[in-house]
């Protein structure tokens, strides 16, 4: 569906005035040096149909995370077609890895609120299609991951100071690689809720819901990130990756609403 090219940023009056005066890394484990010098911006509402690349809001990765991530991420593998962001995974070698794929992330970080994506996952054993939030060091992260070995399930996870191990796999009741669906993360002070197509699927909090009472929860502003990658050495988790041709993940829009 053709969509209007638009980015709406709703900010506080003080920030608007400032802008006007200046005008003229599940185990997704996204990434250390990829984060750079992003700024924490806590008052924006972000709505972006994925029609075209806006370097003022987003950047395309050009690096590799190494380890279990058996690809390099290159800018030309994150491109726009038919009103969607497309991440392509193929067997072009890059950054010392045998495969190349795409990773797309915001320049700024966002605090408590709801993060939403409308996406269609790639299908293929050994792969992960992701939507997640990430801080850099110290490492907090909240994940939505579709494992290509079974695209009728979704895996949720979170990290606090680099400690994960909170995976929860949920049956979707549909094939995430067959069409677009909405996945949302509600991130608050001491809690996280995950939704699919507007329906609550899983949640944790520090008051004893699916986590010990008093458990540490993510608390820092985070970048919004999406990527597609093949695994290596993690066959028991992802299944074995055997390349048989390019794979694609599609993203229709990303939305953030602050609390």
Please state what every model-predicted region is.
Residues 9-18:
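Bacterial N-terminal signal peptides
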Residues 1-4:
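Positively charged n-region of N-terminal signal peptides that target proteins for export
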Residues 29-259:
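GH16 jelly-roll
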């Amino acid at each position: 569906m053709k969509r209007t090219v638009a980015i709406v940023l709703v900010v506080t009056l003080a920030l608007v005035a400032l802008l006007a005066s200046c005008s003229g890394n599940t185990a997704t484990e996204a990434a250390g040096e990829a984060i750079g010098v992003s700024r924490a911006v806590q008052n924006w509402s972000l709505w972006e149909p994925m029609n075209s690349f806006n370097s003022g809001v987003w950047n395309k990765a050009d690096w590799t995370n190494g380890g279990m991530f058996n690809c390099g991420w290159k800018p030309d593998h994150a491109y726009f077609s038919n009103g969607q962001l497309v991440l392509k995974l193929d067997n072009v070698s890059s950054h010392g890895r045998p495969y190349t794929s795409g990773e797309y992330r915001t320049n700024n970080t966002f605090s408590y609120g709801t993060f939403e994506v409308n996406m269609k996952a790639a299908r293929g054993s050994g792969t992960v299609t992701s939507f997640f939030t990430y801080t850099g060091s110290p490492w907090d992260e909240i994940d939505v991951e579709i494992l290509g070995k079974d695209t009728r399930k979704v895996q949720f996870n979170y990290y606090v100071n680099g400690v994960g191990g909170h995976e929860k796999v949920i049956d979707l009741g549909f094939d995430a690689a067959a069409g677009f669906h909405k996945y949302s993360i509600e991130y608050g002070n001491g809690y996280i809720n995950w939704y699919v197509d507007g329906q609550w699927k899983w949640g944790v909090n520090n008051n004893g819901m699916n986590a010990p009472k008093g458990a540490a929860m993510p608390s820092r502003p985070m970048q919004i990130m999406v990527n597609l990658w093949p695994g290596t050495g993690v066959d028991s988790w992802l299944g074995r990756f055997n390349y048989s041709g390019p794979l694609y993940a599609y993203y229709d829009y990303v939305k953030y609403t602050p609390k």
